[in-house]
Amino acid sequence: MGEYITACGISRKICTQGPDGMLKETLGGQPSIRKYVAHKIAQLENSDRDMRSLFRLMFSEKENVLAESTDGYKIRSLTYGESLENVRRKTARLAALLGGVPRGSVVGLCLANSPDWIETFWAILQAGYKPLLINDRLDDGTIADACAACGVKAAVSEGRQFGVRHIRLAQLLEDADASSVTDDRFENEIFLMSSNSSQHLKICGYTGEQFYHQILDSAAILRRCRAIKKHYKGRLKLLALLPFCHIFGLAAVYIWFCFFSRTLVFLKDLAPDTIVNTVRKHRVTHIFAVPLFWETVYKSALVRIRERGHRTYEKFLRGLKLCGVPLLGRLITRFGFREVRDNLFGESVCFCISGGGAISADVLRFVNAAGYPLSNGYGMTEIGITSVELSGSARVRMRGSVGAPFASAEYRIGDGGELFVRTPPAAKGLFCDGARTEQDGWFNTHDLFAVKRGRYYIQGRKDDLLVCSNGENINPDMTEQLFRADGVQRVCLLPSPRQSGKILLVAE
């Protein structure tokens, strides 16, 4: 039986951790989410803590639904058991296509988010190779440099080639005899490319041991935060929006939740209407995205509200200001902003995370006030995901904290305001400008942070500071948020190309 649970003041009929309903069918025979998580973690702790162990446990609930997608009409589902068989077939095909390539070599993976990405990722490992997760939005030169740095021998893609042996995805989809496939050659290392924000290409190596710690952190989050484990009508479904080739998408979306055999919902394309319609059609419960996504949601909603007239817009602004008030705010969210939810994602969304950069206070306030619990999080390719705000209070989430570091992580703020992180899930090896180094100890993120009452707040990036003629440092991330006006879509601070120490304000 389901029961009504209130999150941010919105009553929703959902199946809970009780013994009845659809939810129990997805818990591997365990009577509750808490016991199911404890059972899976105990299995992981008693394993070899490598990628093979992670693979076996991730696909152990074969009847659970791994993926959903739609062609616009019918929802298509893929179970973990069906996907497991696909992995075995892809492994057999890959082993044949990589004949002559020594096992232990690096194989590039350049695909968009899809069940094929997941299956090819595991097939590369099961065949005895190490995947390099390639961001297909990068230019050919950057990707070629990454392939050279890692010694990539072959790459799987839908068409792009990078000067190494090319394997088309279509070749892996051909039928193959998987009867001889075993996992005794399973590799235990993968490589991710950084976002290259520092203008230096970095490639980070991770093993099963690092993901073991990431999963322990996710289990601790599930114990501390009620919203993150909520199911809507017996199902927990994450929107597969973030690229799996990035640490945020790989760890927080795929590894965290698919280890516990939850469901991913894949998009046909990234058009705004497609995203909104997919969330509503599939009843997506969790959306993790970068700040730009949430800013787009906010601005689109404002446009629609303004179209309703000045009076409606003024009422909306007054309600928005009151949403941080504990009791009154919940009532406004529940009743006053119901129409906002009807025009956005509907009522199924239970938990959201913004990560990958600073998010404005206006956006946080709006999304939380609308009834979608949005928390700010933090992580980097080099260190994994290390913190997220877990408060059940909308007022706390609106402040923009990334919370306290996870149990496995330590934070320290240096004299210049830069955040240093020490954590077992950090990447073990780094390729930077072609040279490999082993990472150990405190990692300098070069991100500026402040800490208040144990909660950490992103202040910007040290590399982005602008130096004025009087020697004062200006932080664009903090300053740009002060320049808000009707009719202005975005603002940007830039150093003057003509006068040293002068700063230009550009508005659109």
Predicted regions and their residues:
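N-lobe entry segment of adenylate-forming
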Residues: 1-99, 103, 160
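Conserved AMP-binding/adenylation subdomain of ANL enzymes
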Residues: 215-237, 244-339
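Flexible, low-complexity linker/hinge segments
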Residues: 42-49, 144, 167-189
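AMP-binding/adenylate-forming catalytic core of the ANL superfamily
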Residues: 413, 417, 423, 446-508
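Gly/Ser/Thr-rich phosphate-binding loop
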Residues: 285-288, 298-396
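Conserved pre-ATP/AMP-binding loop-to-beta segment of ANL
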Residues: 63-65, 175-193, 199-200, 226-237
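Conserved AMP-binding A3 loop
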Residues: 76-81, 189-216
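Conserved AMP-binding/adenylate-forming
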Residues: 76, 93-138, 241
